[in-house]
A protein has these predicted regions:
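Alpha-helix N-cap/helix-initiation motif
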Residues: 13, 91, 95, 158, ...
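Glycine-rich, mobile lid/loop segments that gate access to catalytic sites or pores
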Residues: 25-29, 34-214, 345, 350, ...
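Short, conserved charged micro-motifs
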Residues: 10-16, 91, 153-165, 300-313
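Short, charge-patterned binding micro-sites
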Residues: 1-9, 284-288
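Conserved mixed alpha/beta catalytic, RNA-binding, or beta-rich assembly cores of soluble enzyme
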Residues: 174, 221-274
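Internal helix-turn-beta structural module
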Residues: 273-275, 282-391
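ATP-dependent carboxylate activation and anion-phosphoryl transfer catalytic cores
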Residues: 148-155, 201, 208-215, 220-223, ...
Length: 391
């Protein structure tokens, strides 16, 4: 494991070796037969101090009565996007929502005592294809399911191995999935496809290459920055190209993308539109965004005069309602708290917000603090938005 990057801190000490090894083991890479495990893997740290040239635009000192939020500039230039739609209760695209549910259930089955699928290893991927009605835009059925899951070496032949895993996915994983989702979404699963008896059923692909024994960090070199669509909206909306993980909140790649999701979700929940893409862009060292762009895909509501609200009008209201300076984003969502580990799997957006107690260490002193996780998923601006748009 190579831990690299630039950091700036006056008094922090982190036991990199322990953090890495504990995390790898907790994920599930804890057996020598995986050819990579937390107990025996090498850990190399190349962390070094952040460039002073970058830091000078982010960590400026006040020179009088200036607003401190105006002094802290964006940590980089770029475009960030937030998206929301009415596919699910979480205002997320259905395809990505189902993909995350499938992997969560698969991981739970793997960790069960006396697991029903005891051959499972930690690495896994999923992909769902949904057929939509061309006129209403509503989902009609699940078209294709792809599940690729790492597994132990079987002593029998490959055909038996493939058949066994496929049978378990169909009879264990998918039924467990259906228990986790609303009835309206479960109804889209219309059984497995058969050309004659069930042409409306889903096509199921399980480990399409036929074998998946070598996986995880032994099979692939890292994921950070290489799966940015899985981290966000699964291909819906848009992405500015900047990965989230591995960045502190001064980097607007992360913090502004969270803020844009918060805005899009609250506007859709308030009824401004059924689908909304929010784009913000920044210049390094400059606090306020240089632009705000909105695409409602023709789904915007009508104002009190019966006229459809324009995307330009929505963008203008966003600029009035939400403070998008990095310091204010960080303050609103508590982004300096240790809240990021859960974002490393199952996506950064579309998650359930919750509060939990964490341990903080400063100057060798340990303290407990309750912090908000996934605060950008809260729907606490809906009333404010409805009032602003007279809805």
């Amino acid at each position: 494991m190579i831990v690299g990057g630039e950091v700036r801190s006056d008094d922090a000490y982190v036991d990199i070796q322990k953090v890495v090894r504990d995390t790898v083991n907790r994920i599930g890479y804890n057996k020598a037969e995986y050819r990579f495990d937390g107990n025996s893997c090498g850990v190399m740290s190349t962390l070094h101090e952040q460039s002073a040239d970058i830091n000078r635009g982010v960590d400026r000192k006040s020179k009088g009565e200036e607003d401190l939020a105006d002094i802290q500039g964006a940590g980089d230039q770029g475009m960030m996007f937030g998206y929301a739609c009415r596919d699910t209760e979480d205002y997320m695209p259905l395809t990505l929502y189902l993909s995350h549910i499938a992997l969560r259930v698969l991981a739970r089955i793997r960790r069960e005592k006396n697991s029903r699928m005891p051959y499972l290893r930690p690495d896994a991927k999923s992909q769902f294809t949904v057929e939509y009605d061309g006129e209403t835009g509503k989902p009609v059925r699940i078209h294709t399911i792809v599940i690729s899951t790492q597994h132990d070496e079987f002593t029998s032949d490959d055909f038996f191995m493939q058949s066994k895993i496929r049978k378990d996915v169909k009879e264990i994983l998918i039924p467990e999935m259906l228990k986790k989702i609303p009835e309206s979404e479960a109804a889209l699963f219309k059984g497995e496809y058969d050309e004659e008896s069930n042409p409306e059923g889903y096509i199921l692909h399980v480990n399409p290459t036929g074998k998946f024994v070598i996986g995880g960090p032994h099979g692939d070199t890292g994921l950070t920055g290489r799966k940015i669509i899985v981290d966000t909206y699964g291909g819906k909306g848009a992405h500015g190209g900047g990965a989230f993980s591995g960045k502190d909140p001064s980097k607007v790649d992360r913090s502004a993308a969270y803020a844009a999701r918060y805005i899009a979700k609250n506007l859709v929940a308030a009824g401004v539109a059924d689908e909304l893409l929010v784009q913000v862009s920044y210049a390094i060292g400059v606090a306020r965004p240089v632009s705000i762009f909105v695409n409602s895909y023709g789904t915007a509501s009508c104002d009190k005069n019966g006229e459809k609200i324009s995307d330009a009008a929505i963008a203008g209201k966003i600029g009035e309602l939400f403070d998008l300076r990095p310091a204010k984003i960080i303050e609103k969502f508590g982004l300096k708290n240790p809240i990021y580990e859960p974002t490393a799997a199952y996506g950064h957006v579309g998650r359930k917000p919750y509060k939990a107690e964490v341990e903080l260490v400063r100057g060798g002193v340990r303290t407990k603090k309750e912090v908000q996780f996934f605060g950008w998923e809260l729907l606490d601006a809906v009333d404010q938005v409805r009032e602003a748009f007279s809805l």
